[in-house]
Amino acid sequence: MKMRTKLIIVAGMIIPCPCLADLIPKSHIGIAGIDFQSQVGLDYGHENNVTYQADDQDAVSADFQSVRPMIKAIGARYQDQYLLMYSGDYRRYNGDPADNYTDHFFRFNGAWRYGQMHGLTLSLDDSLGHEVRGRGITEGFRPQQFSDFGIHSPLSTTLFNSELRYSYGALKGRGKADVALLFRKLRIGRTADIKNTDIDFYNYILGQEWHENGLIAELSDQYSLATRFRYRFMSNQRRYEIDSQKDNDEYYLEYGIKSQLTDKTRVDANASWLYKTFNNNPNSRDFSGVNWDIQAEWQPLKQSVFTVHTSQRIKDPSEIGGYIMVSKYGIAYQHFWLVDRFSTTFDYSYLTDSYKNYPNDRKDRNRVFTFAMNYNFRPSINVELKYQLNTLHSNQDSDSFFIGPGGDRQVVRTLGHDNSLIMFTAKVQI
């Protein structure tokens, strides 16, 4: 397998996000006092490995353009608050139309207060996204495999997320108690060509769909103006629509702290003990261990910010059995120039995916380097140039999974990739 790192001036991987940042909102007050705000982001860039191929000879290199609009409506009635939001991401590749995509994100938030001590919030999100060819379900697929399985465009994903939360405590009080019920659902679409080409792989894709019920019980303590503690219990029950052997239950006990330790140092840390069970798979092993998400920030000078971050979590694989332990470590430095209007950022992250309870003991190592230059031309206009280099190496040259009624058809994934892209972004608050 040919793996070579190319140093190409790049402007950053696009990470789907439901909002645009770094701009001061412009309010347009309409009927009934509703506050309308809108933004648009315009991207232009070049990506050297659109489908994350391991072999340079298979890599597709293409220029692209993106339009990312966002609009939201904010309303209030006494202490009650409401939010409606839409954002989109419309990307087109020159010379590679097969990987074009259109994403949509919808959100509703409602917050109601009943007296001084009681609150109720409802959050509904619907994310109509996509899965890049060569990532996720099609990770490690070569161009011939895309053709063999009828994958002529990115798979579409629909992730619905809802939360109903009750809070007890004064709005500006020291502490509060929350109880929340959650429901999430994942569906995968744009599979008609796959169904007509290979029914076994089509059924494999359907096996990745799931729904999940969750419960959160949480206590928050605003210990001081600078420090807040949080204690949380979480339970998730994920059920796969077809492949019940992948069903699992998760139970978390979490402790969190967010504190301004000194004038120059801040920390935001969450640590949890996780117990994960696979009740329908006799060959699986339950997991118990520690997850964490920690970020510390040090600002020795007004114009300089150092950040270190680390996290560990457990995620489900595409196949039956086992789990993936995802660990991340990173460091970043941001410097502000020209009275904070211009900034430069260096960020390096090292990620590992360790496949547990797997026969080949697979371990992937992913290194991501990012350099960004950001300029606030006006409070409502921001421009940015990013460079990012994303390389993944594995201790295995390939991995495989099996499809078909008897699970006897082997599908091989070729592991590793070298991806870089350059992107210029302009964001405008309308």
Where are these regions (language model features)?
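Transmembrane beta-strand segments of Gram-negative outer membrane beta-barrel proteins
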Residues: 30-48, 81-84, 227
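Residue-level signature of outer-membrane beta-barrel architecture
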Residues: 73-77, 110-114, 164-170, 217, ...
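Transmembrane beta-strands of outer-membrane beta-barrel pores
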Residues: 42-50, 77-79, 88-94, 126-132, ...
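Repeated loop/turn-to-beta-strand initiation elements of outer-membrane beta-barrel proteins
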Residues: 79-82, 116-122, 171-178, 187, ...
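Hydrophobic, lipid-facing positions within transmembrane beta-strands of outer-membrane proteins
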Residues: 65-71, 104-108, 158-164, 211-217, ...
